Amino acid sequence: MPPSINEPNLQEMFDSLAPKYDRINSILSLGMHHLWNRTFARMLGKSEHLLDLCSGTGKVAYRYIRDYPGSKATLVDFSEKMLLAAQQRYPDAPFTFIEGDIVQLPIDEESQTLASMSYGLRNLSNPKQALEEIHRILQHNGCLGILELTSPSRKHPLYLAHRLYLNFLVPWLGRLCSKNKQAYTYLAESIKKLPSDDYLEQLFQNAKFQVSKKRKLAFGSATIWILKKI
């Protein structure tokens, strides 16, 4: 399946970054993503099964099953090596794995109660189509949780510092840590290019989702939305 992403080589990039992906998230989030993942899991609420989209190496899914013992998760990602990293890291976790595209999920209609997407929304070339596909597979009143790296408001005192961090420090750290400045530059740019909350929330509404909960983290450096299918 062709990946629903906004760069033709992004699948290869994420494959190459899989061994270092958690370090990348630490850099992009200033080390706060562990706390954010925990907050996200708690806001998702208890369910027997979580469909974790754009799952990466499985840290969010693992956080979820730790917080809700007895639950299981299906991890979906277009990167084979990300899923392989998750299998190797959590060999005993109650996970199943699907390698594929979020806009064409091999999942029955209205078969899921809870889905999540962490740090993946900004990499989608067609978020409208992805949201429509997620809507298709969720049951009535099912929920989709989104955790994404965002930017503080332009009026916020830390806006400029956040921009300087993304523009200069993140690429430098990328070159230092992985010798892949281009990948880190892309990831930093993807945060800056993410549309406004108003735009995204209109997109959610157009896809027949209602925002039931929203939380800004670290002065707006990350945002959690809990969406309900309507």
From Swiss-Prot:
Alphabetical list of PROSITE patterns matching this protein:
SAM_MT_UBIE, UBIE_1
Q: Which InterPro entries match?
A: SAM-dependent_MTases_sf, UbiE/COQ5_MeTrFase, UbiE/COQ5_MeTrFase_CS
Q: What class of enzyme is it?
A: transferase
Task: Kindly state which reaction or reactions the protein catalyses.
Answer: a 2-demethylmenaquinol + S-adenosyl-L-methionine = a menaquinol + S-adenosyl-L-homocysteine + H(+)
| A GO BP annotation | methylation
Instruction: Supply one GO molecular-function term.
Output: demethylmenaquinone methyltransferase activity
| Protein EC | 2.1.1.163
| Pathway named in the protein's UniProt entry | Quinol/quinone metabolism; menaquinone biosynthesis; menaquinol from 1,4-dihydroxy-2-naphthoate: step 2/2
Classification via Pfam families: Ubie_methyltran (PF01209)
**CDD domains noted in UniProt:** AdoMet_MTases
Q: Which residues bind S-adenosyl-L-methionine?
A: T57, D77, D101, I102, S118
Please describe what this protein does.
Methyltransferase required for the conversion of demethylmenaquinol (DMKH2) to menaquinol (MKH2).
Q: Which family does it belong to?
A: Belongs to the class I-like SAM-binding methyltransferase superfamily. MenG/UbiE family.
NCBIfam families for the chain: MenG_MenH_UbiE, PRK00216.1-5
Stored PANTHER family: 2-METHOXY-6-POLYPRENYL-1,4-BENZOQUINOL METHYLASE, MITOCHONDRIAL, METHYLTRANSFERASE
What is this protein's name? Demethylmenaquinone methyltransferase
